[in-house]
C-alpha cells in the first residue's frame, strides 16, 4: 500500500490474519500493472518486481523453513505451558481490534493481556457511542469463552491525537497531557467507555486497565469513578458481571504506591516499553538517545524485580506486556522475577511457550540475581545466552541434522538448507545469521576439502548449540574453483567453544583422508547409522 502506518486498521487486520503487507511503497500501482510477478517480504520490507530464479528459489526454501517451524510448535497451541519444574504460565496476546480475538486464540493465546481500545476512537470525527463500544468489547469476551481478557482504557495524548479532541500542542507529549490525565476534562468520553466496559462484563469476566497512572490520588479517583458507574448501571437495572480494576505500571513512581494501591485495585500490568523509557529518561523514538532505551540494563531489571515483589506482597495480580515479553532471551529473567502472565504479539506466543518448557524457575531466580549484578546490558546478554545453552543442552550430532540424498542446484542452496535446518532444530538464533557467518568464512578461502567433500564452518555468538550437520546430494554440486562435491559436512560452533571447534575439525579432516570412511558416509542409507558412525569416529 502507498499509505498507512503501524496503527492503521488495514495494517492491524493484515498482521492479525497473517497477510503480508508493506506500507509507504511509492509507485506501487505502476508495479502491479507492469510486473508479471511481484515478490513481497514484509519481514524485511522488500518488494521485488519480476524476481529471478535464484531469488524465487531462496524464498521457496524460506517458506519451507517457516512451515517447519510452525509445524514444530503447533502442538503447543492447545496447551497451557509450564516450566520444567511445574510453574504454570499464561501466555496472552496483544490486540487492537475486536476482530483479532478469534485469530489469536486459534494461534495458542491463553487470553488477551492487552486490548488497546484506541483504534475504536481514532480515524473518525466523533467518538464511538456506548453501544458501539459495548458491541466491540462483547465480541472479544464472547470469543474468549471465559479466558482472561484485559481491556485498556483510552490511551490518547499529544503524540497520538484524535480528530475530535482539542488537545494542546506539547513540546514533550510523552511527559504531558495524556491517558488518565485527560479523563477529568473529557469526562463524558471516559464515562461512556466505563459504562460500555461494565455492561460487557455481563458477557464475560473483564479486567479493566488504566494507563499512565502516576499517583495514589489518580488511583483513588479511578476507583470512585468506576464504583459510581457500576452503581448507576444497577440503578438503571442494566446487568453487570465480574470485573476487576487495574493499572499499567509504566511510571516509576508506582513502585512505591503498590501497597496502598491494593486497597483500590485488583491487578497491575507492567508496560515495559514506557517504563524503560521513563526510568532511563530517554525517548525511544529519538535516534540520538535510542541506545539508552535498553530493557536489559541491570538497573531496569532490578526495578522490574522490585515491582513484581511489591505487587505480589500486596496481593495484587501482576502481568507484563510490551516488547520485553516477546524477547525469548529475556524469558528466563522474567521467570526469575516471578512473573507468570506475559502478553505479547501473537507471532511470539509459540516461541515463548517452547522456551518456557525448558526453563527451571529456581535456576532462573539465581540467574536474575546474577544479571542484576552485571555492569552492562552486554554482560547480561552473555550471561543469559550461557544459561540458555546449559538449560537446553543438545548433543553436537543428532540424526535430525542429517539431510540425505537431496536434490540441490547450487552451493548457496546447500548452505541455506543446512543453516535453515539449524534454526528449525533450535540450535541457532536464526538461520540467516548462521548463514552469514558461514559465508564470511567462505570469503576467506573455499572449504572444499577434495574427495567430493566440503566442510563449511563458522564460530559465532549466534550459534546456541555447537553442531555437526551433513548434507548428501544426489548429483555433484559445484563448490567453486572447479571443484564438485557430493557430501557437505557443516560445523557450526559457539564462539565460546573455539578449542572444541578445532578438535572436531582436525579429527574430521583426518578421517576424511580415508576412503573407507568416505565410502561409508556415501553408502549408508539410514540417518541413525551415519550418526553412530560419526559419533564413534570423532569420539563425540
Predicted features along the sequence, with ranges:
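Conserved alpha/beta-domain cores
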Residues: 70-392
Amino acid at each position: 500500500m502507498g499509505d498507512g502506518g503501524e496503527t492503521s486498521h488495514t495494517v492491524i487486520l493484515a498482521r492479525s490474519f497473517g497477510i503480508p503487507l508493506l506500507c509507504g511503497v511509492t509507485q506501487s500501482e505502476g508495479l502491479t500493472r507492469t510486473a508479471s510477478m511481484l515478490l513481497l517480504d514484509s519481514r524485511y520490507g522488500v518488494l521485488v518486481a519480476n524476481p529471478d530464479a535464484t531469488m524465487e528459489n531462496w524464498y521457496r526454501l524460506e517458506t519451507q523453513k517457516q512451515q517447519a517451524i510452525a509445524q514444530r510448535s503447533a502442538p503447543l497451541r492447545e496447551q497451557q505451558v509450564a516450566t520444567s519444574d511445574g510453574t504454570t504460565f499464561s501466555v496472552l496476546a496483544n490486540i487492537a481490534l475486536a476482530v483479532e480475538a478469534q485469530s489469536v486464540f486459534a494461534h495458542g493465546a491463553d487470553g488477551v493481556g492487552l486490548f488497546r481500545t484506541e483504534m475504536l476512537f481514532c480515524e473518525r470525527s466523533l467518538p464511538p457511542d456506548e453501544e458501539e463500544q459495548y458491541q466491540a468489547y462483547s465480541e472479544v469476551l464472547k470469543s474468549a469463552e471465559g479466558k482472561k481478557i484485559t481491556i485498556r482504557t483510552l490511551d490518547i495524548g499529544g503524540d497520538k491525537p484524535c480528530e475530535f479532541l482539542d488537545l494542546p500542542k506539547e513540546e514533550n507529549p510523552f511527559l504531558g497531557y495524556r491517558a488518565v490525565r485527560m479523563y477529568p476534562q473529557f469526562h463524558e468520553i471516559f464515562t461512556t467507555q466505563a459504562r460500555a466496559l461494565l455492561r460487557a462484563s455481563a458477557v464475560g469476566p473483564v479486567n479493566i486497565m488504566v494507563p499512565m497512572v502516576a499517583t495514589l490520588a489518580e488511583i483513588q479517583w479511578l476507583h470512585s469513578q468506576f464504583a459510581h458507574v457500576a452503581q448507576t448501571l444497577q440503578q438503571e437495572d442494566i446487568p453487570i458481571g465480574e470485573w476487576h480494576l487495574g493499572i499499567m505500571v509504566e511510571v516509576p513512581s508506582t513502585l512505591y504506591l503498590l501497597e496502598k494501591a491494593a486497597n483500590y485495585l485488583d491487578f497491575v500490568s507492567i508496560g515495559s516499553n514506557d517504563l524503560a523509557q521513563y526510568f532511563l529518561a530517554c525517548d525511544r523514538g529519538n535516534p540520538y538517545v535510542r541506545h539508552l532505551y535498553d530493557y536489559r540494563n541491570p538497573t531496569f531489571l532490578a526495578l522490574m524485580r522490585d515491582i513484581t515483589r511489591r505487587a505480589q506482597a500486596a496481593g495484587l495480580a501482576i502481568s507484563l506486556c510490551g516488547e520485553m515479553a516477546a524477547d525469548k532471551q529475556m524469558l528466563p529473567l522474567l521467570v526469575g522475577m516471578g512473573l507468570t502472565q506475559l502478553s505479547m504479539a501473537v507471532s511470539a506466543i509459540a516461541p515463548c511457550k517452547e522456551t518456557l518448557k525448558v526453563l527451571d524457575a529456581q535456576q532462573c531466580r539465581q540467574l536474575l540475581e546474577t544479571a542484576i549484578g552485571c555492569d552492562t546490558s552486554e554482560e547480561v546478554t552473555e550471561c543469559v545466552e550461557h544459561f540458555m545453552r546449559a538449560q537446553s543442552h543438545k548433543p553436537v550430532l543428532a540424526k535430525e541434522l542429517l539431510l540425505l540424498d537431496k536434490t540441490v542446484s547450487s552451493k548457496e542452496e546447500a548452505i541455506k538448507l543446512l543453516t535453515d535446518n539449524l534454526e528449525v532444530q533450535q540450535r541457532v538464533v536464526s538461520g540467516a545469521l548462521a548463514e552469514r557467518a558461514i559465508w564470511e568464512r567462505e570469503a576467506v578461502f573455499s572449504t572444499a576439502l577434495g574427495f567430493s567433500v566440503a566442510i563449511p564452518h563458522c564460530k559465532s555468538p549466534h550459534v546456541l548449540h555447537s553442531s555437526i550437520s551433513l548434507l548428501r546430494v544426489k548429483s555433484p554440486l559445484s563448490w567453486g574453483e572447479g571443484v564438485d562435491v557430493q557430501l557437505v559436512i557443516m560445523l557450526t560452533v559457539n564462539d565460546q567453544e573455539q578449542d572444541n571447534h578445532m578438535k572436531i575439525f582436525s579429527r574430521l579432516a583426518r578421517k576424511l583422508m580415508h576412503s573407507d570412511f568416505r565410502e561409508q558416509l556415501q553408502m549408508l542409507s539410514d540417518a541413525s547409522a551415519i550418526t553412530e558412525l560419526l559419533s564413534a569416529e570423532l569420539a563425540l
